[in-house]
């Protein structure tokens, strides 16, 4: 509903964000008749209506930063089935060159090196298993934490990969301090909404964004956590709340 209010003649594309690994409703965004760019930086390996992210939107962008579900030293990637977008991406990543030394747009040196590509190729077969473990941990959290904090919802048609498991509670700062006292790391991601930053300053009210920024806390969720680790984290949050 909010997206429909923003569509105008100047709209060139819609960017849907798969926040924390939860796939956005791409088909709903497609209904507006403008290209959809899917920000899948946090959802590598996720599914939407049984399809992998990367083959749903007009253009999909991935991050391979070291903390991501599929990671190397920090490069990124973009995939598309449209030749016109592919041509632009290839130019942008190579100083804007359409061919060698023929520069006809502003671009960057954004080519992935072979070493990082090799690392990603070797890690790719493990991605589904890693994501499965993240979902299993999320299931453990959900089973108990829903009585103490607001737990993350999974979008309809999305198969969440839990790049982050983010709880919501009005006392997240106190919870975070208590967890740290127990040797458990947590993090307040995006404590300042985009519309309140200097660059994107907007005087309008975005109540959902402001609520999430004020009350969200990410707790550990990765494939190397043991069941005992997860139980300890659950018990610490119960004690903190």
Language-model features and meaning:
Residues 74-75, 115:
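A conserved catalytic-core signature of glycosyltransferases
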Residues 5, 13-17, 47, 84-241:
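PLP-dependent aminotransferase class I/II
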């Amino acid at each position: 509903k909010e997206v429909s209010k923003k569509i105008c003649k100047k709209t060139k594309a819609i960017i849907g964000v798969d926040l924390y690994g939860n796939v956005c409703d791409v088909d709903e965004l497609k209904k507006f008749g403008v290209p959809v760019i899917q920000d899948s930086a946090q959802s590598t390996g996720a599914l939407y209506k049984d399809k992998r992210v990367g083959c749903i939107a007009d253009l999909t962008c991935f991050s391979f930063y070291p903390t991501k579900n599929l990671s190397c030293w920090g490069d990124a990637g973009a995939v598309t089935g449209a030749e016109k977008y592919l041509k632009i991406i290839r130019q942008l990543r190579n100083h804007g060159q359409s061919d060698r030394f023929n520069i006809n747009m502003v671009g960057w040196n954004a080519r992935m090196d072979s070493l990082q590509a090799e690392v990603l190729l070797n890690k790719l077969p493990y991605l589904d298993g890693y994501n499965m473990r993240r979902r299993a941990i999320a299931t453990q959290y959900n089973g108990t934490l829903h009585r103490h904090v607001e737990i993350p919802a999974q979008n309809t048609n999305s198969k969440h990969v839990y790049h982050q498991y983010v709880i919501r509670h009005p006392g997240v700062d106190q919870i975070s301090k208590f967890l740290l006292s127990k040797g458990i790391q947590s993090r307040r991601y995006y404590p300042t909404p985009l519309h309140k930053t200097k660059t994107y300053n907007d005087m309008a009210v975005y109540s959902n964004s402001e609520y999430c920024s004020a009350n969200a806390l990410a707790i550990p969720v990765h494939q190397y956590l043991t069941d005992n680790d997860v139980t300890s984290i659950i018990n610490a949050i119960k004690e903190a709340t």
